């Protein structure tokens, strides 16, 4: 069944500037700037009215309804990112061969994973900071998508194939996600 009219107002928090050009949204706040392009989505209107962002569509089927609420979630994540930021925690796990992880330019280098001689590399997305502290890796940034993708890149680069995962648990795993400055964790 189609929803005849979907309308949502998102309050713009204080200290945040929003610029909307067509389906491109640019959000600027105290921690930085995020820009997202929703031009691949048709039939949904995004506009700024006073101190609110209005997202609106008509005759929405299941797909358009999902896109509508996804746009709203992206905008709210952008607001959180430019005011607080996001942080992911990863744990380096090894049993016999000590794994060495270091940040070099725009990549994370993983050495000696299960005794391998080759260096595994994971790409760091732009605008994301990666810190290695002992057996923990901390990934921080404003854009939740880039922070999550960087953490996933590190996790995938350390994935071991050809071994029983129940026996060989060596690798790097995400164990905590949080909004910087809040106690809420996922």
Swiss-Prot record:
Disulfide bonds, paired cysteine numbers: none
Q: Which InterPro entries match?
A: Ribosomal_uL6-like (IPR000702), Ribosomal_uL6-like_a/b-dom_sf (IPR036789), Ribosomal_uL6_a/b-dom (IPR020040), Ribosomal_uL6_arc (IPR019907), Ribosomal_uL6_CS2 (IPR002359)
Q: Which GO terms describe its molecular function?
A: rRNA binding; structural constituent of ribosome
- One GO BP annotation of this record: cytoplasmic translation
Protein family per UniProt: Belongs to the universal ribosomal protein uL6 family.
Q: Subunit arrangement?
A: Part of the 50S ribosomal subunit.
Function field: This protein binds to the 23S rRNA, and is important in its secondary structure. It is located near the subunit interface in the base of the L7/L12 stalk, and near the tRNA binding site of the peptidyltransferase center.
Name this protein carries in UniProt: Large ribosomal subunit protein uL6
């Amino acid at each position: 069944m189609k929803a005849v009219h979907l309308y949502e107002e998102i309050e713009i928090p204080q200290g945040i500037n929003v610029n909307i050009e067509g389906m491109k949204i640019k959000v600027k706040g105290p921690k930085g700037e995020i820009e997202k392009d929703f031009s691949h989505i048709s039939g949904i209107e995004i506009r700024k009215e006073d101190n609110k962002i209005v997202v609106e569509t008509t005759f929405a089927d299941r797909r358009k309804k999902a896109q509508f609420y996804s746009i709203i979630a992206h905008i709210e994540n952008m607001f959180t990112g430019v005011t607080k930021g996001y942080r992911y925690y990863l744990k380096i796990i090894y049993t016999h061969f000590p794994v060495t992880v270091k940040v070099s330019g725009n990549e994370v280098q993983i050495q000696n994973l299960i005794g391998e001689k080759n260096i595994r590399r994971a790409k760091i997305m732009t605008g994301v900071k990666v810190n290695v502290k002992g057996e923990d890796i901390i990934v921080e940034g404003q854009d939740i998508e880039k922070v999550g993708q960087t953490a996933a890149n590190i996790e995938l680069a350390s994935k071991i194939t050809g071994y029983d995962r129940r026996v060989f648990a060596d690798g790097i795993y995400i164990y905590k996600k949080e909004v910087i400055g809040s106690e809420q964790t996922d």
